[in-house]
Structures are given as structure tokens and as C-alpha cells.
Amino acid sequence: ELTRLIELNTDLCDEAQGEVTIPPISLKQSDFKEGYTVQTALAAYAYYNFFTHSMSPADVIDICKKKAIEAFDNVVNYANESYKKYCKMSNVEYTKLPWKTRVYTWEELYVELTEKHGGKFTKHIYNFAKELNEKQPTLDLRLFSIKVIEEAWKWVEDKSPAIVAFFGSIFSARIEMTGKTEKEKNLLSAVDYSIKEVQNQCENPIKVRMFYPYISDSSFMALSDDVDSIETLGKNMPSWKTKYFYDVEDVLSVNVPVVNIGSFGKDGHKITERVHMKYTFENVPNMSYLTIRELLK
């Protein structure tokens, strides 16, 4: 139900400067059973990939929590309606099911357990995460986070069903060029100049897009989100500073405007991957050179 509400939901696309991200996509769904048994799975997990142009990590975790609440409400209502029908069919007295909607972010669960158990919990969960990484350094980052949450759940007294929303994978920061700073203005102006100079050598018009719609190393060259948003990211990432490290200060020490002047092609990362030779090996180097030269004036 949660996947139905999130996956390919265009209401969750992020629009900025006239460009729209693709909607969230489900990357994996699984229960915790190691093999086949006739027992109903007690727990499950799902990964969703969010693409952002202007949304912060705080915005994303808020969206996930709201969708989790909606999904939980729907499932509880559906279960009660189905159970009511079954009781009628079986001539059994219907009693409303005891389950209620219960959704946490990882930060909320962590705070609740800290308030109840104090330093005993925080020390235990930190040592657990640290030792888990030392014993299984190659463990997938997402599975690492799940194991940390499983361990924390042992400290929860109320074992009734719940959803925990968290950040499980690496953080590829959004890069938004607005032209609001002098450096951004200069870079955008230099790019425009290089395009005008090279355009007459191209068969097709060169179009500037304000966002690179894929994963790029440029995400580690600047930070468009504020520090508070990054703190929200860390507080909702079980692997933060035990297995996964994102040095905000290092990124901020660079913090330069970024553009991607790259090749044009098709079927990236496939056996049929290919590029437009003239554009890639002539136009792109020329635009890169002219952009740099213009910036150095």
C-alpha cells in the first residue's frame, strides 16, 4: 500500500525553474524471512528513490511520513472491513481489530527511546552500529541501517505494528544554480557565451537545462541545502557517523557553482552505449575551453 502511494506518484515530483524531476521509484521490497516458511512475515522493508530539485532532506522525510500514515490508515481500515465481512460470513461476532496507525521517523524513534532509557540506549545503539561495521565492513549500507533499526526496536515495549521512515542510502546533494550570487552569475554567463560561440558548429540547437537529472560527482562540490537540513538528514540516517560519513565542512570549504558540460548519447551503462561523436569530441571540449577562458578574464 505504501508503494502504491509513493511509486510513480507525480504529485511527489519536485518542480523548480520550469523543470520537473521524475517521480519516486521503488528500488526494492522484501520481508525479513531468510527462506520459505508457512509463517506470515512479521516485518518488511522497502526502498524508495527520491529525485529533488528544490526539496530538502527535511521535506523528503516529511513526505515519507505523511504517506506512511496514509498507507497505515488505509491498511487498518481495509483489514477491519475484510474482517467484518469474514465474521458475517462465518457467523462470528465482529470485534474491531486493535491495531492503530503508528508511524515514526528514525529521529522520533531514537528520541523516544532516549527519553525512556537515557544514555544506556544511546551508548548501546552506537556501540552496536560501530561493532556491526567492524565485523561486517562490506555489509550493504541499506541493510546496515535496517539492522540498526531492528536492534533499536528491541528496546520498544509496545510491539504493535509500526512503520519507521529513514534515510538508508548515500546522500547525493541537489545542485541548484539560481544566479543569485556573483559566482553563479559569472559561470552562467560564461556558459551562455560558450554556447553562442559553438552553436554555429552544431546541427541541432544546444539547450541549457538548469538541473542535471542523474547522479553526479558535482553533488560533492557544493551544497544548496542549509546546514539545518543536513542535520535532519543525519538524525534520520541510522548509519550516520558509524558507517556513512558526509563531511559538511569539507563540502562547504569547496562550495563552488557547478555545471555539467557533457556528452550526448544513448543507452548509458548498457552494452549498446554510444555517444554523438562530433558533439562529444569537438563541441564539448570547445565549450569547456571557452567557459573556462571566459571565467579567467
PLM feature spans:
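Midchain, well-structured core segments that form catalytic/ion-binding scaffolds
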Residues: 1-148
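An extended, acidic, His-containing surface patch that forms the Zn2+-binding/catalytic region
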Residues: 84-297
